[in-house]
């Protein structure tokens, strides 16, 4: 865009990332009034607002597009300049990726191990629900996202990773306490279950599809940890939908049991990333796709 000063967008990025004008000024080593002036210059240039001035400040839809552009340029710049200057002392490149909790708890870290140990990179693995992570890529907050969405957004690719199979499990003791009469509409409404957060609809969808039970008809804990799901189930506190990949040993040993045999919840997941990638970003995408396709059911 002719006439667009990237210092203006840098100020916008700092305000959003730091949660306010004062901390943005500290980050940029300029005065708070200078930060405000740069934002105003950007809005004057575009003839529209780029920032919702609340606490904390949030970008408008136009602001999100600008931040996406700016962050892509920064990543490419970070990789290209040290190469052009033959500089081996550059700081690690900082990358944010959006993932669902279950992928992080099972296969994602092994997929990224080689890149994380052999390249100068600092990763921020931000956890979002499978249906929400794509929004973070749209806004430019992350450079890649694991999502249930198969269609890529503009300027991006969507590579199929594989299938996540979920099993509804409980401990034998829990099963005897709550499901001695069988797993059905009546018993499921009295047994405590677990969801990740208010956005997690996997469990509710499973109960609705197979038992015609609505969300407000069950006892449901919210626990924001995939690893805690396993502990809750093993401890006999609740029954849970857990990725089969995560509990193969527990199922084999009988510590956990499949309480709805024949009913499997499966989701196809995709890796969304920019079409034009190079350097460590390209390596990350290749590592994720290759590892997932080798270890997840297709």
Swiss-Prot record:
Keyword list, A-Z: DNA-binding, Transcription, Transcription regulation
CDD domains assigned: PBP2_IciA_ArgP (cd08428)
- Domain HTH lysR-type per the UniProt entry, residue ranges: 4-60
Gene Ontology MF terms in the entry? DNA binding; DNA-binding transcription factor activity
Question: Which residues form the DNA-binding region?
Answer: 21-40
- Please name one Pfam family that this protein belongs to: HTH_1
The record's listing under Gene3D superfamilies reads: 3.40.190.290, Winged helix-like DNA-binding domain superfamily/Winged helix DNA-binding domain
The job of this chain, per UniProt, is described as: Controls the transcription of genes involved in arginine and lysine metabolism.
Its subunit composition reads: Homodimer.
Q: Per its UniProt record, what HAMAP family does this chain match?
A: HTH_type_ArgP
**Similarity field:** Belongs to the LysR transcriptional regulatory family.
Name the UniProt record assigns to this protein: HTH-type transcriptional regulator ArgP
Q: Which gene encodes it?
A: argP
């Amino acid at each position: 865009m002719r006439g667009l000063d990237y210092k203006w967008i840098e100020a916008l990025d700092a305000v959003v990332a730091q949660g306010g004008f004062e901390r943005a000024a500290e980050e940029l080593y300029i005065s708070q009034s200078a930060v405000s002036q740069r934002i105003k210059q950007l809005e004057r240039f575009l003839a529209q607002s780029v920032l919702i001035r609340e606490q904390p400040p949030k970008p408008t839809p136009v602001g999100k597009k600008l931040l996406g552009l700016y962050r892509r340029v920064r990543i490419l710049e970070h990789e290209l300049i040290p190469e052009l200057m033959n500089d081996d002392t550059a700081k690690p490149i900082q990358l944010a990726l959006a993932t669902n909790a279950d992928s992080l708890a099972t296969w994602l870290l092994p997929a990224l191990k080689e890149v994380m140990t052999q390249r100068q990179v600092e990763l921020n693995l931000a956890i979002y629900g499978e249906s929400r992570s794509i929004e973070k890529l749209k806004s430019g907050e992350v450079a890649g996202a694991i999502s249930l969405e198969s269609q890529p957004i503009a300027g991006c690719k969507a590579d199929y990773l594989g299938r996540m199979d979920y099993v509804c499990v409980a401990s034998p003791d829990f099963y005897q306490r709550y499901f001695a009469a069988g797993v059905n509409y009546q018993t499921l409404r009295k047994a405590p279950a677990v969801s990740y957060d208010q956005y997690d609809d996997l469990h509710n969808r499973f109960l609705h599809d197979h038992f015609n039970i609505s969300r407000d008809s069950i006892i449901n804990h919210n626990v924001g940890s995939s690893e805690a799901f396993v502990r809750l189930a093993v401890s006999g506190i609740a029954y849970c939908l857990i990725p089969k990949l995560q509990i193969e040993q527990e199922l084999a040993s009988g510590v956990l049991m499949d309480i709805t045999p024949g009913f499997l919840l499966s989701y196809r997941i995709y890796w969304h990333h920019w079409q034009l990638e190079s350097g460590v970003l390209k390596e990350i995408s290749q590592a994720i796709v290759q590892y997932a396709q080798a270890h997840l059911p297709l």
